[in-house]
Amino acid sequence: MSLPFYTIDDFNLEDKTVLVRVDINSPVDPSTGSILDDTKIKLHAETIDEISKKGAKTVVLAHQSRPGKKDFTTLQQHAKALSNILNRPVDYIDDIFGTAAREEIKRLKKGDILLLENVRFYPEEILKRDPHQQAETHMVRKLYPIIDIFINDAFAAAHRSQPSLVGFAVKLPSGAGRIMEKELKSLYGAVDNAEKPCVYVLGGVKVDDSIMVLENVLRNGSADYVLTTGLVANIFLWASGINLGKYNEDFIINKGYIDFVEKGKQLLEEFDGQIKMPDDVAVCVDNARVEYCTKNIPNKPIYDIGTNTITEYAKFIRDAKTIFANGPAGVFEQEGFSIGTEDILNTIASSNGYSIIGGGHLAAAANQMGLSSGITHISSGGGASINLLAGEKLPVVEILTEVKMKGRK
């Protein structure tokens, strides 16, 4: 597949100072500061290691959480974790673009790796502006003169237009890291060259995201069917005239999703037969799973899809040549209500189709179940992959594409 942006392969990195933007934002214990899950650090270690071994002086830029949150910390522990994963020294400095950071960058030798401080300690990083405006921020103007090449590997943040993500690409020869390259190849392939039949399984509680994706993939013809689960399914059931019971209808209203019920009516009419809804659900009665036909839902919380629906959905998944899934089928963390999520994941993993899971809770569930080897691609960036599938432009990809169009390498 021909990519519209440069990758690591397009650059000679020998003895060059390379700035690499990664997304190693990780779960951190707020009381000890220790990293609870180093999955993202392991993921990006591949790109960092390759750049360093090609003789570059590697400067790593990353963020952790955001101001006001308990896990908004320094990147000192991340440097230690990265060093352990790479089995080689990774230096850390508690500065981003000040004199200390710049002097440390200038002292780097071939093969050295330096992790700068949490980029979100810098207030301008939170601003969302045009890449050319971000290129004029203090951080970019201070750092770019001592950098030769910028590599962006932060796919999970590709939907954000912030200085560290888009500003450097305006000033420097720039390309995508290995994670960015792999993610975009997989997702573009699923959208532009999806083998038919193509089935999307959309669930979870982020109704706005799912409905954006549903509308885009049905309208542009890349999907043949959308199987709805989770709160997304409840929205469409209500839109189709099903009585969900006061508890479930109030839940939708309190979440601020009532407008999507009307939107659901329009979509059901426009894409008649292509949007599939559960014909039975599992509700929580005295902390136990009880299944009901959707025509007879009691005034109890819906926590999962029912077994008849699981069987019906499995047929669509097994027949599909391309499958994309995002969001769990129900409250899978609660005992007795993980059946829908688990069975759908098992069916996807055992299918012969090209399969993608869009990150987040569903990806975590697949990993916990040991099914990741049966999935063609598990995305590292839920928000970015959802935006791409919803037809939205990703600012990071846009500016990297502009770099290649202008031949700036």
Swiss-Prot record:
Origin organism lineage: Archaea, Methanobacteriati, Methanobacteriota, Methanomada group, Methanobacteria
Highest taxon above the source species: Archaea
Organism of origin: Methanobacterium bryantii
Name of this chain's protein: Phosphoglycerate kinase
The keyword Cytoplasm is assigned to this record: yes
CDD domains: Phosphoglycerate_kinase
Main location: cytoplasm
Entry keywords, A to Z: ATP-binding, Cytoplasm, Glycolysis, Kinase, Nucleotide-binding, Transferase
UniProt EC number: 2.7.2.3
